[in-house]
Amino acid sequence: MVRFLRPSSTSRDVLGLVHGTAGQATLIQQYDNMLKNFLHMPMAHPVIIICDNDDGIVSLSKKVRSKFDKIVSKTTTDSFYHLCLNLYMVKVPEGDPPAATDIESLFDPELLTKVLDGKTFNPKKDHEDQTEYGKVVFAKAVIKANAETVDFSGFEDLLTRVEDVIRHYAKHSAVPSSSTVTP
C-alpha cells in the first residue's frame, strides 16, 4: 500500500515541506540529522520523494551530490536514488530521449488545457492570479474533482519506479526476526 503525506501546518513546520523543490531540498539535506533525535526508529517503510524532472531538479541535484555524492540530473535515468536510511528520491520519468518533464506531463494533454473560471493552467505558477491557475488548483479542481474519469495510464512508468523502491527497501532493510535466527 502506498500512502501520500497530506500537506498540513505540521508537515510545513516540522519537515519544511513548502514551495515544492525548495522544501524537498531542505528535507534531503536534513533528513538523517532530524532522525538522530529519535531513540526508536522502526523504519518499516521507505520514504519516497517524487520530484519533477525539470529546472527544479538542479537544486535537488546539488544537495544530493554534496550530501550523498550521487549524481542526479535531467538526463540521468536511474529508476530511483537511494539517499540514506529509508530515504529515496524518484524522478518523473525522463522520456526518450531524456527531456525535462513534470508530473503533470503524465496526464492526457487535453486535461492541461482545462479552463477554470476563465483561467488557464500554468504549471510554473505557485498561486492563482486573474488569468492563470497553478498546480495546487489543477490537482484539486481538475484531477481530484474528476478522478473517476481521469486517465492515469501515463503514470505507469512512475509507479514502476515507486515499486522498485519498495522492493529495494524490503530487500535491503530486512532484519532477521528471532524466529529465523539460528544459534
What are these regions (language model features)?
Residues M1-R65:
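Conserved helicase/translocase motor-coupling segment
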Residues V2, I28, D32, R65, ...:
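Generic detector of well-ordered alpha-helical segments enriched in charged/polar residues
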Residues S9, P42, L111, T120, ...:
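Generic secondary-structure transition motif, activating predominantly at the C-termini of alpha-helices
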Residues L15, H19-A22, D117, Y133, ...:
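Feature targets compositionally biased, intrinsically disordered low-complexity regions
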Residues H19, Y31, H40, H45, ...:
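Histidine (H) residue identity feature
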Residues L35-F38, V64-T76, V162-S173:
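Hydrophobic, Leu/Ile/Phe/Ala-enriched alpha-helical segments that form helix-helix packing faces
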Residues A44-V150, V181-P183:
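Activity-critical C-terminal alpha-helical subdomain
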Residues V137-P183:
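Nucleic-acid enzyme cleavage-core boundary/entry regions
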